[in-house]
Structures are given as structure tokens and as C-alpha cells.
Regions:
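Class I SAM-dependent methyltransferase SAM/SAH-binding core
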Residues: 44-45, 49-99
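A conserved beta-strand element that flanks and buttresses the S-adenosyl-L-methionine
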Residues: 111
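Class I SAM-dependent methyltransferase Rossmann-like catalytic core
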Residues: 1-25
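Short catalytic micro-motifs in class I SAM-dependent methyltransferases
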Residues: 114-117
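C-terminal alpha-helical "lid/dimerization" subdomain adjacent to the S-adenosyl-L-methionine
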Residues: 144-190, 197
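A short glycine-rich, Lys/Arg-flanked "PGG" loop and its adjoining helix->strand segment in the class I
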Residues: 125-137
Length: 213
């Protein structure tokens, strides 16, 4: 297993960098289905960066308890800060999600926002199987990702942009993955079914809601 990228280097500038490059769009993508996550009680959030989504989830769902997993101590510190007093409902785990063993057995909410694109397809498949074994029968998984549409926009704009982003994060964090994984196929094979989808920025961004089968 390759060493995880070092996001400690960008923790302090993560949110400003995001707003500078994509404005509000990544945030809107993360929150596509936030209103449908109000009945879940035990959540697992992987690689949430500075934790703004986790903070929003805690605000919208006053009963949910969250396990937050990240390989960056600085990102976890930002998550606690953004969650404020609600951080009492969060257990943070400083770990590589690929190797971390879930402690619960009845997660009914999984969230990965712009995280699966840091993994290879085989790693997504293994992670999805591992998580499915630790979720409830009615669990949902909310996903936000970059995509490359199979059209002129994908060929001329989205594709080059995604490649540039991978190069930038290789320089900034040491991220070794350099292409988007086939996460949909991997999740489907692991027992997850996509039930909703919302595309933004001409298909460059996609928010998805999946349910355990």
C-alpha cells in the first residue's frame, strides 16, 4: 500500500484555494443531498478535508454521531474547529482510510466528498466492500466527485482540468493517483446502488446518493 498523500501542507489554505478555483461549486456539490440526511444516526465521513461538510451535517441533523477518518492531523484539527461545540458528537480517527478498520457495525450514513478520486479503482472496490460489511441494511452513501463527460466539454475542458488538478495535488501533497477511478463500478459490485444524481458545471462535478442493496 502506497503512503497516503500529505494534506497537512494545504490544510490552512484548503478552503481559500477551493473558493479561488471553483467558487461555491464544490460546496454546492457536497450539499446536494444534505436535506435527505436528517434521519441517519451513525455516520462515517472519510477524507472530509477541513470538515465543513461534517459541520453542516451536524447542524442539519442534531442527532447524528459521526466517525471522521483522515490521514491528516491538520485537517482533523480544522474539522474540530469548524464543528465547534458540535464536535462533541464526532470521534476523529487519524488513519489511512484504506487500512482503517471501522469500529461500528451499523453505520447508516457514509460520506465521501472529493475523496474517492484520491484512490485507485481497486482501492475504492476494497473500501466499498469493507464499508458495506459495517453498514445497516438501509444505509446511504453520499458521494461528490469530479467527472469527465464523454462530449466536447469533457475532451476540451474537463479532461485537461482534471489532469491539471492531479498534477497540482501531486506537487502539493505527493498524491500518486493521477486518474479518476471507476468508482461507480466498484461501488455497485460491492453492494451499493445509485439512486440519485445531480450534475453541476456542465458535468464536471457530480453529487450522488447511493443506497445499500
Amino acid at each position: 500500500m502506497k503512503r497516503p498523500p500529505d494534506f497537512n501542507r494545504v490544510a490552512q489554505i484548503y478552503a481559500p484555494m477551493e473558493k479561488l478555483t471553483f467558487g461555491p461549486w464544490l460546496w454546492r456539490c457536497r450539499c446536494c443531498f444534505i436535506q435527505e440526511l436528517k434521519t441517519q444516526r451513525i455516520g462515517l465521513v472519510l477524507g472530509d478535508g477541513d470538515g465543513r461538510f461534517t459541520a453542516k451535517l451536524l447542524e442539519e441533523n442534531p442527532l447524528v454521531l459521526v466517525d471522521a477518518v483522515d490521514a491528516s492531523v491538520e485537517m482533523l484539527n480544522k474539522l474540530r474547529l469548524n464543528a465547534g461545540l458540535r464536535s462533541a458528537r464526532v470521534r476523529v480517527h487519524l488513519a489511512d482510510a484504506r487500512a482503517w478498520v471501522p469500529e461500528g457495525s451499523a453505520y447508516d450514513l457514509i460520506a465521501t466528498h472529493f475523496f474517492l478520486d484520491c484512490l485507485a479503482t481497486a482501492e475504492v472496490a476494497e473500501l466499498a466492500r469493507k464499508i458495506r460489511a459495517r453498514t445497516s441494511a438501509d444505509a446511504v452513501w453520499v458521494v461528490s466527485e469530479f467527472t469527465i463527460p464523454d462530449n466536447w466539454f469533457g475532451w476540451l475542458v474537463a479532461g485537461p482540468l482534471v489532469r491539471a488538478l492531479y498534477l497540482a495535488f501531486f506537487v502539493l501533497t505527493g498524491l500518486r493517483v493521477q486518474r479518476l477511478p471507476k468508482y461507480r463500478e466498484a461501488m455497485a459490485e460491492a453492494g451499493w446502488a445509485r439512486i440519485k444524481e445531480q450534475r453541476l458545471l456542465a458535468g464536471l462535478l457530480v453529487g450522488e446518493l447511493w443506497r445499500a442493496q
